[in-house]
Amino acid sequence: MSEKEAGIEVQGTVEEALAGGMYRVKVDQGPTVLAYASGKMKKFHIRIIPGDRVKLELSPYDLTRGRITYRDK
């Protein structure tokens, strides 16, 4: 990814698991966003449940959607 398209890394807490592999995540320094699990998380069957702390990557073009890249222990 070029510098212009680099995502914004933030942390948050999963509030709700939605249909279709989507999650509602409350970002620490901001609003609630819709996020999905990254491909590697799906591949290795990493489960994400409400209450989990996660790292998100937000698109600079749409700050209301993101990709979950890491689930904290």
UniProtKB/Swiss-Prot annotation:
Residues 1-73 form the S1-like domain. One of its GO terms (cellular component) is cytosol. Component of the 30S ribosomal translation pre-initiation complex which assembles on the 30S ribosome in the order IF-2 and IF-3, IF-1 and N-formylmethionyl-tRNA(fMet); mRNA recruitment can occur at any time during PIC assembly. It is found in: Cytoplasm. Keywords: Cytoplasm, Initiation factor, Protein biosynthesis, RNA-binding, rRNA-binding. One of its GO terms (molecular function) is translation initiation factor activity. Pfam families: eIF-1a (PF01176). Belongs to the IF-1 family. PANTHER family: TRANSLATION INITIATION FACTOR IF-1, CHLOROPLASTIC. One of the essential components for the initiation of protein synthesis. Stabilizes the binding of IF-2 and IF-3 on the 30S subunit to which N-formylmethionyl-tRNA(fMet) subsequently binds. Helps modulate mRNA selection, yielding the 30S pre-initiation complex (PIC). Upon addition of the 50S ribosomal subunit IF-1, IF-2 and IF-3 are released leaving the mature 70S translation initiation complex. This is Translation initiation factor IF-1. The gene is infA. InterPro entries: NA-bd_OB-fold, RNA-binding_domain_S1_IF1, TIF_IF1.
